[in-house]
Amino acid sequence: TSDVPAADQVIDAQGKIVCPGFLDIHMHEDPVESDGKIYSDDEKAIFNCMLRMGVTTAVGGNCGENCCNPADYLDIVDRDGLAVNVAMLAGHQWFREHAGTVDKYGPATESQKACMAREIGDALDRGCLGVSFGIRYIPGIDMDELTAVAAPCQKAGKMIAAHIRSDAEEVFDAGCELMETGKLLHIPV
């Protein structure tokens, strides 16, 4: 419009591109140091660069990976502050190892699945957006484990995401595995 709106401050953006902030939905977070910090001031610079590129929110915990409990990570980010908003997915692999399943080719026991589901439910309650799986990296996961671990998302109204089991000729079957999980639990994929 050529009419200047009434406002406390008007910014002349003529000839500029104005858009909402971008979301980086696939970030891998850095580990928490022994002093309880994630990023030094120098390391925080990457988030300043992201902001200059227009990214205002970054999502970590992708591919089933977390460097620590993702809800604890969010608490540290809230405490220390970053130039962009950070959201987290609860990475299945971290919770699987935390429950005692270290063999990526082997199945999880019923008690390990129950432990994962309980801990992931807590992470969802504490602010995680959903659960991520790195099915390709944990080939021992089966449909029973997928649904058991994803089940807390149903109660919390959260989503699942994954690096699927395979690609190329097997990509459709791999995608269907994840979609079937969402369909069984009535949760977004």
Regions picked out by a protein language model, each given a short descriptive name:
Residues 1-19:
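Histidine-rich, glycine-flanked metal-binding segment
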Residues 2-5, 78-80, 152, 183:
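A generic structural signal for short, solvent-exposed coil/turn residues
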Residues 6, 82-84, 187:
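A short helix-to-beta-strand connector/capping loop
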Residues 8, 30, 69-70, 142-143, ...:
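Short Asp/Glu-rich motifs
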Residues 12, 24, 163:
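Acidic active-site catalytic centers that drive phospho-/nucleotidyl reactions
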Residues 16-18, 22-132, 153, 157:
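Divalent-metal coordination cores built from histidine and acidic residues
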Residues 107-133, 139-189:
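Histidine/acidic residue-rich metal-binding segments in metalloenzymes
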